[in-house]
Amino acid sequence: MRRLVAVFIFLAAGIAALARPFIVLAYNVENLHDVDGVAQFEDYQPSKYSKAHALTKLTNIARVVAQFEGGRGPDVILFEEIEVDFTPSKTPPDYDAILARYAGLTIEEMLGPKFDAAIGDLPAEALLAKAFADRGLTGYHVIAADNIRTPESTHSLEQKCVVFTRFPVKHVRSHPTLDARAILEVEVEVDGAPLYLFDNHWKSGASDPATEPIRVANARTLRARLDEILRADPNADIVIGGDFNSQYNQKQRYPKMKVTGINDVLGSQGNELAVRSPARDLYNLWFELPAADRGSDTFHGEWGTLMQLIVSRGLYDFRGVQYVDGSFGVAKFPGLNMEPDGTPKRWSFDGPAGSGFSDHFPVFAKFITVPDGRTERYLPLHNAAADRGGPPPETKIDFSRIDLEKIALTADSLPKGATLRTEANKGKIVRVEGRVARGTRLAVEFLGETYDVWSFDAKLRAELRAAHKAGEPFRFYGELGQYKERWQFVIQDASWVK
């Protein structure tokens, strides 16, 4: 009897080991640059982007990643917007050797008193791996996409996709695509099972019909490779993630776009049960959340879903890797990477070291491995997602729910004589009590300075202009920002005028 019990315990332990859950995180870090002093973007020239700025960015990325797995970090991270190394070495970087070489220094020392030309020559992802290691986020293999593009491309590439993973890497391939960062394919082995990872950063301009044909080309690049894999194994385990510069419901949200990359070409869709049929092989995990909770970025007062995770049918069967149903989420942490109004705390260059995180929230999902080896059996789904079409869900940010009195800056809270016009104050909500300024623009005189007043709601803009004459009192809550170098307050909702 004891022997049988021992055998049972051994088998149970083996199954438990196989079923260890892991997380895949997709994270656009908003332009993580190295410190070699060579950059294509104006904002990242040495006069504006210092070693202290780089340290802040590295530290803050690590702080977000450390929110997962009890501080250990996810086992798979798909990064976007890491700078291409414009001063590369003659040989590819050996990230393990770099970490070993600088094991006796901290990232603060490397970018501070111990900085030298060799450190300046390190690519951004190597600096990130070091910042991770200092925080106990260790054991990662680092894979960077090649800086390649199609012959038809007309734009140079400033950024690349990078994958961090703790799983053994079996195969790596970079896929050049039209006027966008190369799509990075990484095949890993998870408890003996193959898992394909695809890290994407498609052409920007989600709402622009003029750029959608480029995203269609990006989608075709990815779809062609997926078809190769799925022809060989229709139940292959594939996780597709990154910044697609497309909404999960691109075709529904922008009906004037006759052909969309994400929906029409790639085949991303929201019927969770449909992946069991031959006609549909991909499911977009945004459909795991209620429509009101779908958002990872903001633009003109509306939520966007540019960051996405998409899974293949194989992640619903009982062979190899399996998706944990209902585990998809948005990585927004109050007091860390989230503003008081619930939007992403963007990166800011203000001050000697900068501040903030990214203009995108990361997205994540959990997975496990299953020992059955059965592709004909599918994960039972309770309340399976089913996209039934119809009008697109509301995307306007509900600013009326914000406790303005609690979070707003006031004139009394500022030091005497201080200006609001700093990078650190951008994005903050301010209680404005001033007077309407003279001129053709609607503007307010506040704390001795003049600010434009704007709203993305055209009707509200017209009402504000009609109701407020030059010299009259003007009281409202506004989000501080800049547009074309002019400082302004954005009134996000009619309830903010009071």
Feature locations, PLM:
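Metal-dependent phosphoester-hydrolase catalytic domains
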Residues: 174, 178, 228-236, 246-416, ...
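N-terminal, active-site-proximal structural segment of metallo-dependent hydrolase catalytic domains
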Residues: 17-158, 350-351, 368-406, 493-495
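A long, amphipathic alpha-helix that forms part
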Residues: 211-234
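Second-shell loop/turn segments in exported
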Residues: 44-54, 110-119, 149-152, 174, ...
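Hydrophobic h-region of N-terminal signal peptides that target proteins for export
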Residues: 8-18
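Structural recognition of the beta-strand scaffold that forms the well-ordered cores
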Residues: 23-26, 75-81, 141-144, 161-165, ...
